[in-house]
Amino acid sequence: MWNIMKYVCAEGIVFRGLCGQRCADKRRSVRLWVRGPSTHQIHAVHNSVPFSQTHVVTSPPWRVLFFGTDSFAEESLKHLFASRQKAGSGVVKLLEVVTLPKDLPVRRFALQNQLHVHDWPNVNVQDRFDVGVVVSFGCLLKENLIGQFPYGILNIHPSLLPRWRGPAPVFHTVLHGDTVSGVTIMQIRPKRFDVGPILNQCIYPVPENATAEQLGETLATMGAKLLIDTLQNLPEFVANRREQTSKGVTSAPKISSSMSWIVWEEHTCDQIDCLFRAIGSRIPLRTLWMGEPIKLLDFAGKFLTSLSGAVAETPGTVRYDRESDSLLISCKDGWVAFRAVMLKKRLSALDFYNGYLHPFFLKRFPRRQKECVFESYKTKDSNTPLGREDAHKVQNL
């Protein structure tokens, strides 16, 4: 494994690890020579893939190629762009962008600010960049591409790796009720996501009741600042990088619609709260009402006031509370409240009560009285509620 290791001496700066010899030079960049007619091939610092250029920059400003797509990635691109604009004091000299050929936040920002855009996968590095940066890109980069950057390609990951490897770390942080999160700067490796060595990390206490969107916005800004900090002393961070431990590895797969089904017999109040804050803004929580899917909207939290006969209620039992103007639903360990639902159209809690729970309605349709319970959805060929596996995932690790 090749490393840049810097030593300060009276004669200048000594670099080891770029080849099998020592090189000393007081300038920012170093040319490596060996005996004979040809220039020695320099190896990329992140692995032993041959790197063709003979001129390695050893301090900022850097030539950066940025890979990204969404608003989380856009925040890092904004910080890199701002650094490039700082004449004489920034860490970026050249900045170009690689993104998908779609209308995406990263593409819009790049075009608005006259940054050169490469459409993935048509990327031609041509020995013009010192380091790559990839954020929320979603595509594996091949080894021959990674090897063309002297300092490799850095990744900003919104978790404290190795916890929550995968495409949805912020959602799983909230879903599992983590009290601590953070950002990791790592070097990527080919063939697998989120397994490379760690260069820098920053810890962030998760605020109580934070949603995935709120946490994601905070970590995006934190990650962008941590990236700039890392680039300021990149050779030192590369030299002192550490491999990820196998202890504490967890997976953060993409969120899916099956996660939105509530299992009233198994979900606790806290688990439903975490589930809503994790996915509720993108995928409404769902249950069954009289055999029809119904979406639960405007979650109002755990209902703390005791109800007469509440202890004996069947999970999924629904009541209307006038004081809070919400529907109260019993779950494994208590009651949770929602202020609106979506059946065929959006209904407030009061509208739902008047249409389906009012004593006048129940007198007219006495057979419906036994059906006034929210039920977990069950597959046609199994008695197992859909979402039960996801219900277990909600439990704190």
Each language-model region and where it sits:
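Well-ordered beta-strand positions
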Residues: 146, 175, 288, 319-321, ...
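Short beta-strand or tight-loop elements
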Residues: 181, 292, 325
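NAD(P)-dinucleotide binding in Rossmann-like oxidoreductases
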Residues: 280-283, 290, 313-316, 340-345
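A short acidic-to-branched-hydrophobic micro-motif
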Residues: 254, 261, 290-308, 336-344
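One-carbon transfer enzymes
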Residues: 2-281, 333-337, 343-348, 353-397
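Short acidic/glycine-rich loop or secondary-structure boundary segments that cap or lie
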Residues: 194, 283, 295-297
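Low-complexity, glycine/alanine/valine/leucine- and proline-rich hydrophobic stretches
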Residues: 303-336, 344, 354
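Short acidic-hydrophobic surface loop/beta-edge motif
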Residues: 262, 285-290, 327-332
